[in-house]
Amino acid sequence: VKDKLCSLGFEEFDGPLVETEFWDCDALFMPQFHAARDIHDVYAIKNPTHAKSIEEPFLSNVAAVHRDGGNTGSRGWNYNFDEHFTKHLILRSQGTVLSAHQLAKAKVPGKYFGIARCFRYDKVDATHLSDFYQTEGIVLGEEANLKTLLGFLEMFAVEIAGATDVKYVPGYFPFTEPSVE
């Protein structure tokens, strides 16, 4: 997968296995009280339990967007963002945390990907483990839109997964809009 994505012009990104709640959820505009966080039943780090700090201006900007929308034009989530909670250390629960880090420094236009080892508490059985991998990608450009995304997804399905037929259906994920599967 890595070789194929590189051959398609993507640059690889990666990040630490231990993350803060800030990068894992808050930077992705997932409010600290939201039920969407329940699906990210995380493994907490015992020692140390919290990061010393979160990089600025990221902390201030994200906190403002959660509180009242900041300068984005959004109303935000209208709650008191907890700057202590956001420093809580956890094992990475989703690959999108890598995208959040990358977006903070990415060049436009650009194509980026990461293959992320993730951890979530789950009952271990024949089809579930507590760790898994997610492939994450970002395409940045002035003209990029949903049609661009669907074109890339079709290319991945054919070039990487060997699909002969691709069908899109609307999907619901509480933290993305629009969503397709």
Q: How would you name each of these model-derived features?
A:
Residues V1-E181:
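TRNA-recognition modules of translation machinery and tRNA-sensing kinases, especially anticodon-binding
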